[in-house]
């Protein structure tokens, strides 16, 4: 596996990617088909990441239905520190051994995990972790969390709760909804102990229990505080009400962090392609904006995607102005340019309030 580092947008840190050789990719793709045939029947319904026919919007829709159906008053927002780098090979192979009887399949997975990484001209052994970038890595991550988190929650913890609860997970990103505050606090404490058994660490600074639901805003106001919000899959979720004010609504907006990162990434791309001919440049710009709207254009986020398109047009104006004599591109000329190469309209594409 060849390890390369890519910059994390908006951060000085870098993310390691493990890129397997072409032959290994073919073998891994075959292993994925075999393992999926077994584990798709085992995975819990509320595991949405990297599974056939499921995606981020399904997880967001499940969260919306759960919170707005009533009985949810607390949310646990959780974060696992460096999950992919801390998967313990011994535990993963034990988990696989529960369902996979073919020793050849297990040997292939073991070889992939122990293949080592080629970095800076040297081969280094890999004693733990599953490299991000591998074809099979997302599935192995799901299997690891299925045994270390999902089964513990569904078969043990949830049965001891005094009220309703629901865990919604997308890969290593998950939130848990609770009716009772003591259940939420207890989960927060026991989660750390549970994941610690399998070499995983809860990021304490990013894991919190927050009051949420129909009465959270009024209670916060009575205390002179702002209502709490939480982030999940790039969106900030907050307490609100319907237009007539009669019913509670959970609404969402592109998170500030993701918004900054997306704009910074776009700005860096523009800088790198500032000499690209306008027709070719705008073809890619339109595709990028369309992709952003396809993901973030969800119920209640009109403001978020509208602001993104507005900021993209401002960056375009700035960089196109730098091509020639500074100030040569007037606003009038730029408007004509956008008529010739229009940006996608910021319309809501995904309804999170309706069943799929």
Task: Give, region by region, the residue ranges found by the protein language model.
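Non-catalytic terminal/accessory segments
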Residues: 1-356
């Amino acid at each position: 596996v060849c390890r390369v580092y890519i910059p994390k947008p908006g951060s000085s840190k870098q993310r390691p990617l493990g890129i397997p050789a072409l032959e290994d990719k073919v073998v891994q793709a075959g292993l994925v088909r075999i393992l999926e045939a077994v584990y798709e029947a085992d995975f819990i319904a509320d595991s949405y990441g990297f599974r056939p026919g499921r995606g981020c919007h399904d997880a967001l829709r499940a969260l919306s239905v759960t919170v707005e159906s009533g009985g949810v008053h607390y949310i646990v927002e959780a974060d696992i520190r460096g999950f992919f780098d801390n998967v313990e090979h011994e535990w993963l192979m034990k988990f696989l051994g529960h369902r996979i009887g073919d020793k050849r399949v297990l040997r292939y997975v073991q070889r992939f995990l122990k293949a080592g990484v080629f970095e800076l001209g040297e081969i280094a052994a890999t004693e733990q972790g599953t490299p991000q970038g591998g074809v099979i890595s997302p599935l192995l991550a799901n299997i690891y969390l299925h045994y270390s988190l999902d089964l513990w929650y569904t078969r043990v913890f949830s049965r001891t709760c005094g009220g309703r609860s629901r865990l919604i997970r997308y890969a290593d990103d998950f939130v848990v909804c609770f009716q009772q505050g003591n259940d939420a606090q207890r989960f927060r404490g026991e989660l750390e102990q549970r994941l610690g058994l399998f070499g995983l660490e809860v990021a304490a600074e990013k894991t919190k229990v927050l009051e949420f639901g129909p009465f959270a805003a009024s209670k916060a106001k009575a205390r002179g505080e702002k209502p709490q919000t939480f982030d999940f899959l790039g969106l900030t979720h907050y307490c609100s009400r319907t237009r007539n004010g009669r019913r509670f609504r959970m609404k969402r907006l592109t998170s500030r962090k993701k918004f900054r990162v997306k704009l910074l990434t776009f700005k860096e791309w523009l800088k790198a392609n500032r000499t690209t001919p306008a027709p070719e440049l705008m073809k890619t710009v339109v595709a990028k904006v369309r992709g952003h709207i396809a993901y973030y254009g969800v119920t209640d986020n009109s403001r978020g995607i509208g602001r993104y398109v507005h900021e993209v047009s401002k960056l375009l104006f700035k960089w196109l102005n730098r091509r020639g004599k500074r100030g040569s591109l007037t606003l009038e000329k730029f408007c004509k340019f956008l008529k010739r190469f229009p940006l996608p309209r910021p319309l809501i594409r995904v309804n999170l309030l309706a069943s799929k």
